[in-house]
Every structure is written in structure tokens, then in C-alpha cells.
């Protein structure tokens, strides 16, 4: 018998003024200069941190983390469409207690970020964990 996978559903509303609302929840208005491209990079950083934190806590660690991302958009050679052709993500995190081997934890954090897994290109990660 096949096991049914968990399903996560999300919704957001964007009004004519650009304000984003979670139905029945909070509203945010991006500051001047924020584009959908910036929001995608921010979502990738947040998702990467959340994924890392989830797996670290399962192993008994407390986490404090911050991050940044840079992306390059240009015309792809494959189809002539403008798209992200490179994304670099840097995450700085502290684990308490410290971990001896981070290999599996970092692999799971990258693998289980839904935003990164959805992209057509694989982000390049740089992790700094102490």
C-alpha cells in the first residue's frame, strides 16, 4: 500500500498597491526598490535557514542563523528567455551544541528547501557554521 505524501498548501494575495497578504493573516508591503526577483532571493534564504533549522533541531541543536543571496538574470542560451542563470546563497549559522560533522545536516538543509528544490537551476551554497 502506497503511503500518501504530506501536502503543504500556501496562498497569498497581492493587491493593486503591491501589498501581499496571507488570507486571514498578516500583510506586508515591500519597501521601495524591492522587485519580485529580490523576493525570490529572500524566499530562498529564508527557506534555506528554515530547512537547516528544522534538521538541526531534530538532532538536538539550537540554531541562530542569517543569510544572503545574489542572483544573475540574463538571457538563457537554451531558450532565449530571461531567467536566473546563477544564484549564490551564503548562510551563517551557530549551532548549540556544536556539531562534529555537518555533511549530512547541510545536504538535508539544501535538499529540503522547497524554494531551492523548485528552481530550474541549483543554487550554489556557501555554509559557515560554528
Mark where each language-model region is.
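Extended beta-strand/beta-hairpin segments
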Residues: 1-45, 50-130
Amino acid at each position: 500500500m502506497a503511503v500518501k505524501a504530506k501536502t503543504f498548501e500556501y496562498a497569498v494575495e497581492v493587491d493593486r498597491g503591491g501589498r501581499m497578504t496571507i488570507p486571514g493573516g498578516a500583510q506586508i508591503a515591500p519597501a521601495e526598490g524591492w522587485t519580485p526577483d529580490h523576493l525570490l532571493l529572500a524566499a530562498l534564504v529564508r527557506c534555506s535557514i528554515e530547512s537547516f533549522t528544522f534538521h538541526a533541531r531534530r538532532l538536538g541543536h539550537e540554531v541562530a542563523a542569517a543569510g544572503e543571496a545574489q542572483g544573475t538574470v540574463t538571457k538563457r542560451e537554451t531558450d532565449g528567455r530571461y531567467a536566473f542563470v546563477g544564484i549564490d546563497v551564503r548562510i551563517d549559522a551557530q549551532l548549540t551544541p556544536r556539531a562534529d560533522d555537518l555533511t549530512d545536516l547541510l545536504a538535508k538543509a539544501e535538499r529540503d528547501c522547497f524554494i531551492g528544490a523548485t528552481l530550474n537551476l541549483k543554487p550554489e551554497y556557501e555554509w559557515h557554521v560554528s
